Amino acid sequence: MEKKSIQEDFRNYLAQSQREKDFCYFSGKMETISVNHPRSIWNQKANAKLISANEDVNRGFVFSGRFETANQAAQISYEASQKIHNALKWLIHKQGIPIGDKILIAWGVDGSNQEDMFGSTDVFLGKDEDEGEKEAVADTQVEFAQRLKKAIYGKEQDLGHNEKIAFLVLEAATTGRLSVSYYQEYGFIQYAQLMKTVERWHFAHSWKYDWYDARKGVWKSRIMAPSIFDIAEFAEGVERDVKGGKVKGDGKKKKIESNEKILGNTIVRLLPCVLEGRAVPEDISRKLLAKACHPLCYSEANWNKLLKITCSVIRTKYKEVGSMEINKDSIDIPYNYGRWLACAHEIERRALRSASEKRETNAMRLFTKYAEHPNKYMAIVQSKIQVYETKLGQKAYWLQNEKYRISQQLNQNPLEKLVAARHLDGRMILGFEAQMETFQKKEEKEAAAGGEANERIEEQN
């Protein structure tokens, strides 16, 4: 109670000591108007202000349009300004989601304890009846914001909430100005559509992802949509070495680095794809596809992740061949060219592994050229893997048969189309990835069968 009394006394003191009152655009009341609004809303951009005017400094040099003074554009009372900025600062600290050089805030704006923003502090912050005189806790839907963060970053589909929700993205356009680069509000009716839209994103862009659990020492996999952060990072970034770092099976650890501002801009462009159901911008899809066709520019782990992200993004564009399962009946030219290259890669990979050699396969070395001129480089790749087919012997028969069946699918197309094929699109990547996933499943079954056989032998002994 003493704390509240001090706050009231301070507000009364300010009201008496400050200048004459005017109409506040926020509260709709005659109150003392604020001239200098707070800064340091966001720690990373400490000097940036959301509301500011420097007319006295640049008078005569800045075109102000129909306004002669800053107050004609908008005038906000001191109390409203303090409440707005402190609430925003608190929201950023409590449930902000960093996206590059920007910050995303999601919060509930229509809870029962937020009926009057300019009422008492208890009404504004929301008081927990069970806590009596304890510090008030605002109902800004923290749990929802956390679930949204997981949804946006590709980890969860069900947000499970029924309140009115707002989304806000802030960025510092300059060192002194903070701007709103994205804002969207969902009421009770729109919320149900929002949930369907987010779920649709996760369903439409899901793919199988593999990662290594260093703590348990095992590989894990899960079908999920990629995070928009990963999409933006791989679309805009380049691979760099991590000093002193190592990753299993790859020697030096590699990471993807990108310009913070470009990364943030791309993530903001992807937000409507998750929240509003828009298609992924075509230029982002093209960047991912172009980079996926350069496997030698990445470590094996990063390229595999890039490949899966690319498939997740482009699969909605090529629905006939966009499944994670192989479409064996398809005679699509780019799709089957991709499948054929996967077979060539697998044959050489198995031969190199049996000989304890570790180097890139010819399929990987010629991947980029193959995508540009598939008919020409198909013959070149075939000539280079013949020796490995011979080395594998009977072990390569099923792979050779698969490669032969794919060739038969290709031959159902007119010869002139096969010869004229150039610069294969995303269907090649989808075909390659689907075929490699089939090989991985078969390899896992073989490993499991081998382990069971060894266990039976040990039991017999």
Give the positions of each predicted feature.
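Extended alpha-helical scaffolding segments
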Residues: 1-8, 31-461
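Short Cys/His-rich metal-coordination motifs, predominantly Zn2+-binding knuckles/fingers
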Residues: 27-29
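Short metal-coordination and nucleic-acid-contact micro-motifs, chiefly zinc-binding Cys/His arrays
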Residues: 16-22
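Short amphipathic alpha-helical segments and helix-helix/interface helices
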Residues: 11-15
